[in-house]
Amino acid sequence: VRYGNVSGSRGSVIPFFKTLIDEGQTKIPITDMRMTRFWITLDEAVDLVIKAIGDAKGGELFIHKCPSFKVTDLAKAMLPDCEFEDVGIRPGEKLHEVMITKEDSRSAYEYDDYYIIYPDLEWWEDVNIKEGGKKVEDRFYYASDNNPVWLSVEEIREALKDIDIVY
């Protein structure tokens, strides 16, 4: 299973922003104003793991189709009147999350609400490819900045309520 930061988890920026807001901060540090992320909840991540356990034949990567959001929109959803402080991107930090690389596209298939990257190995047999999927285009690239599905500030605010973060 491959997915980005789970919304509200320790690896997510949400707890960091929440702490700043709870401390009375009105200026939110943003490493890069163009930064985007995928939105996946803990429940969605668990469901994907269970699906992978049930459907996998061995070696596949399951990737959930998630909406994207701008980190600046997340800050606005949590603190509507906030100001941004551009603090610069840190070493190793990614501007956008990448779930399927162009190299992965050679063996990636799209299903209704997820993708599967099948092993590109000699021992893998095509009969193991799950029915109902469509081979993605060559050089397909699935990242948080080129995703067709985006959350608005209001949709982020509603999604935050679903993970018990209310402002």
Tell what function each PLM region has:
Residues 1-167:
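Strand-loop microenvironment adjacent to phosphate/nucleotide-handling motifs in alpha/beta enzyme folds
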